Amino acid sequence: MLIATLLSASPFSSHVYAGTDHGLFNSVATELNNDVSQQKTKKISGTVVDETGLPVIGANVVQKGTTNGIITDIDGRFSLDIPEDAVLEISYIGYLTQSIPVGNKSSFQITLREDTQKLDEVVVVGFGTQKKVNLTGAVSAVSGEQLSGLPATNIANMLQGKLPGVSITAETGQPGREGTSIRIRGVGTMNNSDPMILVDGLESSMNDVNPNDIENISVLKDAAAASIYGTRAANGVILITTKRGKVGKPILTYNGYVGWQKAVRKPHHLSSAQYAELYNEGRINEGAAPAYTAEDIEKYRNGSDPDNYPNTKWMDLLLQGSGFTHNHNISLNGGTEDTRYAVSLAYYNQDGLIKNASHERYNVRVNLDSKVTKWLTFGINSSLSRREIIAPTNPFSNDIGQFFRQANRIPNTFVNQYSDGTYGRHIDGNPIAWIEAGGKSTSVYSHAVGSAFAEVKIIDGLTLKGIAGIDYNFDDGKTHIKEITYGDGSVQGPNSVEDYLDRWMTVTLQGILNYQKQIGKHSFKGMLGVSRESYRKNLTKAYRKNFPSNELTELDGGSTNGWSNSGSALDANIGSYFGRINYDYAGKYLLEFNLRSDGSSKFAKGHRWGTFPSFSAGWRISEESFMKNIDWLDNLKIRGSWGKLGNHRTDDYQYIAMIALGQNYNFNNVVADGAVQTKANNSNITWETTKELDLGFDAGFKNNLVNVSFDYYDRYTDNILAVVPVSLLFGLDAPVSNAGAMRNRGIEVSLGHVHKIGNVEYDVNGYMAYNKNKVEKYPNPDKGDKIKMEGYAWDSFYGYECTGIFMSDEEAKNSPVHSAYVKAGDLKFKDQNNDGKIDAEDRVVLGNTIPNITYGFNLNMKYRDFDFLASFQGVADVYRTVDTEMMWGFVNGQNATERHLDRTIVENGRVTQLGHFPRILINQSHNRVMSSFLAMNASYLRLKNLQIGYNLPQSLLKSIHLNRARLYVSGQNLFTFTKFPNDFDPEVKSGSGGYSYPQVAIYSIGLDITF
């Protein structure tokens, strides 16, 4: 990903020409120079394959230092007359050249290894491809091969730590609902900051893409690279390209793994006896009598009466799922010069860490390319996917987080199951009883994508391409909540069923005209396009409760008392015109201009259209004549860009008045149907606009032994849609206006090193990115626990600076405090303005909720038939909070963890033991205000992936008729280095620690086979 290099020309490639007839591979004439013709020669033969065992078609096989050579045929075979003392040189674009002495051998089996520097050269950009060495915008890329075999639960998790400037956070480990957040160069707006994602040119979701189908992923980060997508590109663009057929005989491959999951981190709760002792301590601290006697505590400790004095390990009881996962992929790839195909089937299954939780996915993909005539090419991209996500339900909702909340907050002093088999209960219920009852939520997502293109060659260099595509999604769901009966006779309910059906469809039509021309050292490329997209969404819901039996799951079985039905529909359309011009002089001076004009139905007439230009330029200094004698410098390019982008990702119909139905009224003693406007509209709203400057350079040293890339950017987003406060006398909810502004500035640095020492090949690469966010304009300031104000980073923590713990009642009495209840053992806060009191004016910014620094580094090694991969990912300068009950413990009698053993102990108004936590309190809450004690440093470094593989030797594979077989073991989320409390994952969303399904580590064994 981080390595960029120039393709070096083969010493023989300029003498070999291959047509469309495969027979030409065998009929290419060899040129024998005079020296060769004078020597004694012999015939040799062999096969050239890649590291997967597949034949390399068209590889150059030449006698070194001569033009005596040939190219391999469709099966990778060659035959050549050559002197015995000659050296055979084998080369092919994208692979490392090999030199082999002929000696007395007559048969050769040659394996070419990939040159990662060269394979990285061409990257996918908007509506086309570009040589990386000629890029003038900021683009990061990763190949599908770099993701192959990783046991991650989704594609976004696979990308963590691999793309500079891209921050990816997985908020939970729940199967199918990981809650992954992707941010490119920070948060660009107060509204939707998600990037635009396209799969094979159509806007779509990456959740339904089979990772093994991916050829490459490109991330367009700056305005120059992304502006060709205009309306939705303000937060960056992710382009996913799937694999296409290649010329050659059919190649059948299988890739699969089986794995097991476990929680990365989970809370360690106090035993019942410990809880009772510390609970008593908290009661005494508040001046109340102890709740547990010494006899009670001893019974909890010895376990003699488990029905009345239990020690229930709620989290262990909850995490009883198998955690088993397996993934299987079969693909067929091949074709002729006229027709190529790529077909794949995939199945993925993930069982949860808790019972009745799972994620199952099926994928089918067919990509086809056909050269109908010399001037007409036709192709299709089609895929079908089906995902079924199952989760247990509880009496409150279908939120799986409620199970973890209960398992974390119910003290071990409450019984789970009595000796007679009935269930005990806490005031909120029993999460184990909920699971065993068998209520569940099922969501079945069906996703069909189909597109077809036809490309006409009009004249040399001029083509016209038409594309038609449809993206159809169908989400069919049911939530079944069961009534629970407990051992004490109490009932928790009611039982209920909710059905929903959500359908949405996008139709895309595009026409693209491409032209390229080379005139001497001048190279020109131009593109003009038009696009139309229409989107429609329909949602239907129905709900009933109080079923006569828990086993009834159809709506008709429920009561009509309290039933509800609802439905909604949405239509949206986008029209676009776009173009691009590229100019390249002698590979040294590079220019690019993009322009896109978009019209969106989300805005009123007169405000729908926006125009988004961008400019970029590059200078390859290393190609100048005055640089030719600097042999340690292979490549040096400086580049810069400026562009304007748009964002219309906001709620629909905001320019239209909102009318609420069902507002009935009495008219002449008769209740009449009524409707009323509830929210003011603003017909003047328009695009959020982003202007971005990017300056950078790319350099390669010592035959690309070391590669460096650097970017500085300044991104300013204006006209952000925000609610402007209105007087209460206005009478309606305030409308949105283009009233906000935000700036992101940052740098990105990437380093790469590739080398070979003997039989050891290795590739080390890494990056570091820094982003600083600042709100420039915001009409509705909020100074709560998370600040939303001009001059500060968006959503930063805002509270008191904690300076320690009061050591005595006297110290607390003589110090500025924020509560009359503050005593020895409580938190001490800084009086920022020195006015002798602690109040809201003493609050300060405590830290960012979004990391300012992201980084990652990767190591790939090969030794003979062994390979090794390690991938690390980290963030810094970021802060998180956890759930209040989990943070403090004992809140209103809730549970506590072993961390709370390290508390401050107070006797007779003085601290006798200073701990990390202040003194334990049960009901008093003055320590729980937002402060630097609560907003904790969540920086971390995580070993995301570790993989060791072994390729079976070719001698063995021949006997079992395989081209390639590779065995590997792999792990994900294996180690985390952080100062964040070890009960919680630092990646989890703030405030949800304790409410969230934990992140998972995955250990897997896999197999790759090529037939």
Name each region found by the language model:
Residues 763, 848-876, 928-977, 996-1011:
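Conserved C-terminal beta-signal and adjacent last beta-strands/turns
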Residues 133, 175, 246-311, 322, ...:
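Surface-exposed loop/interface segments of Gram-negative outer-membrane beta-barrel transport/assembly proteins
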Residues 167-171, 227, 622-629, 956-958:
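Active-site phosphate-binding and catalytic loops of NTP-dependent enzymes
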Residues 1-365, 372-373, 377-385, 449-450, ...:
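Short, small/polar-rich motifs associated with maturation and membrane association
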Residues 242, 330-334, 364-370, 450-456, ...:
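Residues on the lipid-exposed face of transmembrane beta-strands in outer-membrane beta-barrel proteins
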Residues 48, 112, 203, 454, ...:
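Hydrophobic beta-strand positions in extracellular immunoglobulin-like domains
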Residues 345-351, 591-600, 642:
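Transmembrane beta-strand segments that form the barrel wall of outer-membrane beta-barrel proteins
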